[in-house]
Amino acid sequence: SMLHHYYDILEKDRFEELYGDLYIGQHPTEERNSYLIIQLNFAVVNAELNNYRKSLDAHCNTVFNYFCDVYADYLPKGLKEGMNQKNGAVEQLDFLYRECEKNDLKIYLFIDEYDHFTNKILSEPACLEEYQSETHGTGYLRSFFDTVKAGTYSSIKRCFVTGVSPVTMDDLTSGFNIGTNYSTSPEFNELVGFTEEDVREMLDYYRTTAEFH
């Protein structure tokens, strides 16, 4: 993604190649190419409520190990081994951001389709009660975003989250009440979210295929 390459410390030698003829290339910010990137994609997480924790842990562990490998020249020795001794995504992310903080390293965390599996869970009425328990109180998903939030006071200096709807984020609000929803901002109305034209096209389509109630 554009943000990934703009902020990734590993891409600093390609900055002119990628952005030299663009406005952001001619007006660079101080933080360009100064971050270590963690990029999660929850679209690959199993949507079955009983299995999603295991799937989330597996995906995060794969990404965290990749992170340790590609940034090995910047990270302290033994970080990967120490991280893999922790149990699950929550403990591993907590370990990574704390160790990066000790070494004055900055993390940019990307989470794509953060609500992919929770939206599928919500489509099953029988799962609603379990979903609520996971996004409230001591639920695992809630704990994960609590950890992300805690990390923003440490080495996770930036976080960019994308999804289909704000439903899950609303349920996680008190656990992750540090974000800004750009999909409702007029300044970004053609960048994220649906335009009025998009909505009208969808309504016209479904009007011909299903009866509205």
Q: Predicted segments — roles?
A:
Residues 1-213:
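Phosphate-binding site recognition
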